[in-house]
Amino acid sequence: VLWIRSIFATSINQSSSGMKSYNKKFVYSICLVSAMGGLLFGYDWVVIGGAKPFYELYFGIADSPTMQGLAMSVALLGCLIGAMVAGMMADRYGRKPLLLISAFIFLSSAYATGAFSVFSWFLAARFLGGIGIGIASGLSPMYIAEVAPTSIRGKLVSLNQLTIVLGILGAQIANWLIAEPIPADFTPADICASWNGQMGWRWMFWGAAFPAAVFLLLACFIPESPRWLAMKGKREKAWSVLSRIGGNRYAEQEFQMVEQTSASKSEGGLKLLFSRPFRKVLVLGVIVAVFQQWCGTNVIFNYAQEIFQSAGYSLGDVLFNIVVTGVANVIFTFVAIYTVERLGRRALMLLGAGGLAGIYLVLGTCYFFQVSGFFMVVLVVLAIACYAMSLGPITWVLLAEIFPNRVRGVAMATCTFALWVGSFTLTYTFPLLNTALGSYGTFWIYSAICVFGFLFFLRALPETKGKSLETLEKDLIK
């Protein structure tokens, strides 16, 4: 604990050259701790996909599409509640308390989901986990954006997406390693009676407990957001955090900009957010958030088993192919971190929307002509790679940047709420579209949505690279 405290208590001296500098050890430490919310978000979101074939047999819902859909989507309802409550509470009570609450929820949900043997309690635990996801999905990138120096803000907010995809990969690997090989002649009853059907799926959920405990411990040592402190009139505490980030000169410059945008302005809230000066940027944020889901890539994670099986793979091969997609997700998120401050946010969003439009067009055509095997895996990996280096991380960067300090909490909550509504719609409609239109028709629809996204970003999306949060407020709120 003393070693942990020493990391978060580090101070810096301003360089003699007068150039802006910052305490990398301190900044990266607090941002990585906040980003652990993303790690647990990613793990909790995807782990259910590997556990699905086994808990459905255990709870006797394998022949009930309604109960199957409820088990998969109940966490989304928790996400909606967590997202809205978090934004309002974060503006009132601060960012740090909500990060601590999300860590505790993740820990409780991880244990409870694997422990319960009654389906209704299993659903309650998944709902609780969804609340944790809803809180962390908005709070983690928002906190990082508020503590990060402008020159590396995009890179650091992208770290949150990196931890999300690491959590996704961790869940995929855990599912693959925990699940014992399934003999080809096993019946559903045999699978239910096996270790996979009795205990394996429980350990898949319990895998999140250790990182959740670490997150809860480390979050105790991070400081409150200096911009929230300044907004609440806690000048000395805000100055203290800013000086620890970049020294006294940095603190003076940042504090002046924060006070200029906060001076003589009303308190934030939904009423202010929906007022005329904020409507344009709010609509932009909501469309960016919803498009991240409606571009279709997340159905590959939620329904990877069905997608790969329709391409001709067995259940055992499917679990390995899912791990391959997770590795690609991680690798190309690193590409986003490397390029976000070089190419900018707008260019990467255009690349993602345009690239996915083309990939989905080809993927749908392959399904139409009943192409199967390795080439289909390649197309799926390409789609994930394109998403991981663009729409996945950059959406969170933009949402954390475009809103003013005094409404950032409620604005992030509103956009995150819209994102999870989009996710619920996507998850709910995919099997319906797949049944009505076939896999080819479904992916052609996603291609058309991506074309719309490309045209919208080309016309309406501003570049935010290299601008302070306060400068962006002056540019966007008129």
Task: Say what each PLM segment does.
Residues 251-260:
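Short, well-structured alpha-helical segments
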Residues 7-8, 15-235, 241-243, 263-478:
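Alpha-helical transmembrane bundle of multi-pass membrane proteins
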